[in-house]
């Protein structure tokens, strides 16, 4: 009789990034493919999480918006309305 051991699949997580006073916090996030990043905007004006030539998430004032990560890699993002706001996502395979 053979014994088979299977690892349970990793559960996807939701990682919160707060936006307050024109700052992404934390500015650097490590995540896995399948995780969701949720940006929570505490400011009174809209922001974006934008990758040049890639995706853009618009986060309305006093609201949240999210994105599920589909590919591994490292990307820098910024707010299109406030270009000094910057963040970095490092996404690895599960």
Residue map of PLM features:
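Extracytoplasmic copper-binding redox domains, predominantly the cupredoxin/blue-copper superfamily
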Residues: 2-94
């Amino acid at each position: 009789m053979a014994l088979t051991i299977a690892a349970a699949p990793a559960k996807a997580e939701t990682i919160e990034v707060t936006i307050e006073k024109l700052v992404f916090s934390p500015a650097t996030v490590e995540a896995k493919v399948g995780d969701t990043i949720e940006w929570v905007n505490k400011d009174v004006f809209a922001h974006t999480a934008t990758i040049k030539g890639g995706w853009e998430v618009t986060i309305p004032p006093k609201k949240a918006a999210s994105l599920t990560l589909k590919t591994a890699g490292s990307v820098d993002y910024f707010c299109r309305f406030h270009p000094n706001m910057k963040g970095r996502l490092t996404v690895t395979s599960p």
